[in-house]
Structure formats: C-alpha cells, structure tokens
Amino acid sequence: MGRMHSRGKGISASALPYKRSSPSWLKTTSQDVDESICKFAKKGLTPSQIGVILRDSHGIPQVKSVTGSKILRILKAHGLAPEIPEDLYHLIKKAVAIRKHLERNRKDKDSKFRLILVESRIHRLARYYKKTKKLPPVWKYESTTASTLVA
C-alpha cells in the first residue's frame, strides 16, 4: 500500500519473530515488565517510547510475548493510557508547529500546502478513531484549540 501524500511505497519493515513465545534467555517476569511500563508511563513517555526503552535498555524484544498483552492494553488496565491516540497526537503536534512557523513566515506557500495535507490526515484519522470508539463522538479538531491539546 502506498503513502497518502507522497510517491513512496513504504515496503521496508522489520520482520517479527515467527515464534510467539517468550525467549528462553529472557529472565524477566511479566509482573516486572508491567511495573516498568507503568513507571515509564508515569514519567510521561508514550507507548512507542516505552517499547524502545524496554527493547534497547532492558533487553525485552517483544512485550506481547512476555506479558501476553500489548503496551497500550497494559496502560489502559492501569488507567495510564493517553486520552488521544499517539499517532493523532503527533500529527496535531506537527500541525501546531507548522502554524507557528506560518505566523513568522506568512509567504511560505509550501508550508501552507503541507499544513493542509497534515490537517486532512488529522481529520481522516479522527474519523477512524470516532468510528472505532477510541475518541468520543463529539471530539473535533480545531486549529485554534490544538495547541492546548499538545501542551
């Protein structure tokens, strides 16, 4: 499947391990992983950042193979899940940064065009999340209040 607003096909990706069980060399228990996930979430890290830290620093290749559930499910169980999904949050953050840039550089036509593309992506993603009930049905993206969502 191709990219939304560019020409790339996006075919490169890392291969997931075939074996879905926990590696034999891993000595960490699922309770330890749960506690560390909660600790990192309380520090303000996103689920993907938590996964990267667990992989790189703690040697946990896949949280799902160790605990049986994904990072976001663990965060939801402990009440630490973000209210806005992570990918939507980063798109809103990008739109706020582009708007801030456009306040200083009014004639930047390319940034104006890119802002339109980013905001259309936000609207499309918000429609999906409303349909899957990850966002409330009355949630709406507005460029005037977007900076408060990201701050």
UniProtKB/Swiss-Prot annotation:
Highest taxon, organism lineage? Eukaryota
Single GO molecular function: mRNA binding
**Keyword presence, Lipoprotein:** no
**Keyword tags:** Ribonucleoprotein, Ribosomal protein
Q: Which GO BP terms apply?
A: cytokinesis by cell plate formation; leaf morphogenesis; translation; trichome morphogenesis
Keyword RNA-binding recorded: no
Ranges in a coiled coil: none
Q: Pfam families in the record, alphabetically?
A: Ribosomal_S13_N, Ribosomal_S15
Signal peptide positions (record)? none
- Tell me the InterPro entries matching this sequence: Ribosomal_uS15, Ribosomal_uS15_arc_euk, Ribosomal_uS15_N, uS15_NS1_RNA-bd_sf
One GO cellular-component annotation of the UniProt record comes to: endoplasmic reticulum
Q: Which SUPFAM superfamilies match?
A: S15/NS1 RNA-binding domain
Q: Which PANTHER family match?
A: RIBOSOMAL PROTEIN S15P/S13E, SMALL RIBOSOMAL SUBUNIT PROTEIN US15Y-RELATED
What's this protein's family per the entry? Belongs to the universal ribosomal protein uS15 family.
What is the protein's name according to its record? Small ribosomal subunit protein uS15y
Give the species this sequence originates from: Arabidopsis thaliana
